[in-house]
Amino acid sequence: MDNEYSILEDSVRNTFGSVVWSHKIQEKQADIYFSQYKCMETIKIATASLTSVGIVSLIFTDQMWLKVLSALISFVSVFISAFFKSFDLQTLVSAHNNSAQKLLKIRDELKLLLMLIHLKQKTVNELADMYQDIIEKLDVLYAEAPRTTDKAVKKACTALNVNHDNQFTDEEINCNLPNSLHRR
């Protein structure tokens, strides 16, 4: 009987690890797109301003280099505007954040399931049914999740393995709990 609980626990732990990684990758992909959006938006504003300054300057002077520079800056401004039309970075940020939030919910369900496995207050079959329900939701979520990049995977690796995101000391947890719930 204990062997059945162990087998189920191993499977749930494996799924839990996968969900932790998937959640962090989706978060990092959203961060990447948000950074790109901020950068492109800043460049767009700067190039639009410089284009206006260049055109106004042409009223007062007729220098060829100013015309060429204004045309180049205008081209960059048009390119960035076209890029924003082709790739809606804000929608991508939202899609990845949404997937990350759904994965967080699944992660919490798996954590609860691991606790129930350890308590052994339910039968293995009941726990396996709960696990199956979670897996079905997870399969749908993975099918609908937006694609991520290798860069997001690398950032997630750093966050989880180097910075130890999602790991808390007892002291950090105690700071956010009432005294009666502190671990001593």
Predicted regions: what they are:
Residues 45-56, 72-82, 106:
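Hydrophobic alpha-helical transmembrane segments of multipass integral membrane proteins
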Residues 62-75:
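Hydrophobic alpha-helical transmembrane segments
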